[in-house]
A protein has these predicted regions:
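N-terminal intrinsically disordered/low-complexity leader segments
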Residues: 1-12, 149-151
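Helix-turn-helix
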Residues: 16, 20, 24-58, 62
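Hydrophobic alpha-helical connector segments
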Residues: 62, 76-101, 157-161
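Short, basic, alpha-helical segments at the C-terminal edge of helix-turn-helix-like DNA-binding modules
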Residues: 65-70
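Short secondary-structure transition hinges
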Residues: 96-135
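Short alpha-helical scaffolding segments that buttress acidic/His motifs in well-ordered protein cores
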Residues: 109, 164-168
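Hydrophobic alpha-helical bundle segments that form small-molecule/ligand-binding pockets
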Residues: 117-118, 129-161
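Conserved small/polar residues in nucleotide/adenosyl-binding loops
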Residues: 185-193
Length: 193
């Protein structure tokens, strides 16, 4: 083992591993991520990667979660979270950014990965989606343009957020990053609620 490899082993962190994994996804799609390919990208042995992740499934789950986090980092303009229409437009912009930065990440094949018995990956994705849903709920609660009393125990902010997010996911799968349909639905629904 060379001195450079020893130094690299000591310098490798989960963040470095996830950054290398994201780079592999950008270059070759998420199927390119494996223990060996990430180790090669980090210039470390596969054993070093196994020190952090027990399996390829665990590495993929963590990588997918980190991609979602990169896509949905908090904006510099916190006003995004005070207005439902601005927030929805921002989410669509972030989906479009994610598609450009990580081509194919949102494909049905990627979503299928989460259904193949990879419980850790599915939990991580659901946690990330939960974060997005909770954010939408907060925006719905705090938007001064939403009529007071529009939500109650029969139709909650979370139920409406789930409908909106479902519409967004369908748009993403179709690679349609125009928020106008979702915004129209939001406007119509808010008027009728």
């Amino acid at each position: 083992m060379s001195k450079g490899e020893i130094m690299n082993r000591l310098a490798t962190s989960k963040e470095d591993i996830l950054a290398a994994s994201r780079e592999l996804i950008r270059e070759n799609g998420w199927a390119a991520v494996s223990i060996r390919s990430v180790a090669a990208k980090c210039s470390v042995s596969a054993g070093t990667i196994y020190n952090y992740y027990e399996s390829k499934a665990e590495l993929l789950g963590a990588t997918i979660e980190s991609v979602w986090q990169e896509i949905f980092f908090h904006p510099e303009d916190e006003q995004v979270f005070h207005d439902v229409t601005t927030c929805i437009s921002w989410i669509y912009e972030r989906f479009q950014y994610g598609n450009k930065r990580f081509p194919g990440f949102f494909s049905l094949h990627s979503f299928g990965f989460m259904k193949e018995g990879k419980d850790d990956g599915k939990k991580r994705m659901m946690r990330t989606w939960g974060h997005i849903l909770n954010g939408l709920c907060e925006v719905l609660k705090n938007d001064h343009k939403i009529r007071p009393g529009v939500f109650d125990e029969n139709f909650t902010e979370m139920q409406f957020a789930e409908i909106l997010f479902s519409l967004m996911l369908v748009s993403v799968i179709r690679e349609d990053y125009d928020p106008s349909s979702c915004l129209l639905y939001t406007s119509d629904a808010a008027d009728e609620l």
